[in-house]
Structures are given as C-alpha cells and as structure tokens.
C-alpha cells in the first residue's frame, strides 16, 4: 500500500495471488507428508528377510541399513510437517490481512 490508508485493487490482488500460491505449496507439502507416512508404514511392515530398495536417480539400490533409512524418512517427514505448520500460519496471516484490506476497500 502507498501513502493512502485505502488499499488499492493491485494490493488486494497481490495478496490474493500470494494466498493462492501458498495454498498450492500447502497442498504439495501435504501430499509429500502423506507419501512419507505411507512409505514409513510400508517399510515398518515389510518382512525383515525381504530386501528393500531405494531409488537413486534412475537406479534402484538395495538398502543395507533399514533402521537408518527409517530414521531418515521420519526426519524428512518431521521437517515437512514443521514446514507445513509454518505455511499454514503464514496462510492464516495473509488471509486475515486480505479480508481486512477487502473490508477497507469496500468501506471507502
């Protein structure tokens, strides 16, 4: 916003675009978290006698240390979950600001 207290349509549109981009990020990160959860569950339920493979680029490598892989997956899932929480907080903040700006715009 400029010197005026009344928000411009450009200000409101910029916030709407930012909000839309954040929602896209939240959806993407949420899907990734879900995939990690499924992978962790599958790995935990896997018969220890059966080999487990990990994708590295275009090749599959057999995993020697399942516990290490499981901890790595859990750590990545936790990091994504924390990032998701921060994005949700940011979304809420921007949504409130958007609503306030839209209300100010309509009043004047």
Question: Each predicted region: which residue ranges?
Answer:
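Short coil/loop "hinge" linkers that interrupt or connect long alpha-helical coiled-coils or helical hairpins
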Residues: 42-68
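Short, charge-rich amphipathic alpha-helices with coiled-coil/heptad character
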Residues: 1-20
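Short amphipathic alpha-helical/adjacent loop interface patches that line ligand
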Residues: 19, 33, 77, 84, ...
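Charged, heptad-repeat coiled-coil alpha-helices that serve as long linker/dimerization "arms"
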Residues: 29-30, 46-49, 84-85
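A structural signal for alpha-helical segments
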Residues: 7-10, 24, 31, 68
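Amphipathic alpha-helical coiled-coil segments
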Residues: 26, 70-90
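Non-transmembrane, heptad-repeat alpha-helical coiled-coil rod segments
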Residues: 45, 89-108
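Short, basic/low-complexity N-terminal boundary segments at the transition from targeting/disordered tails
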Residues: 20-41
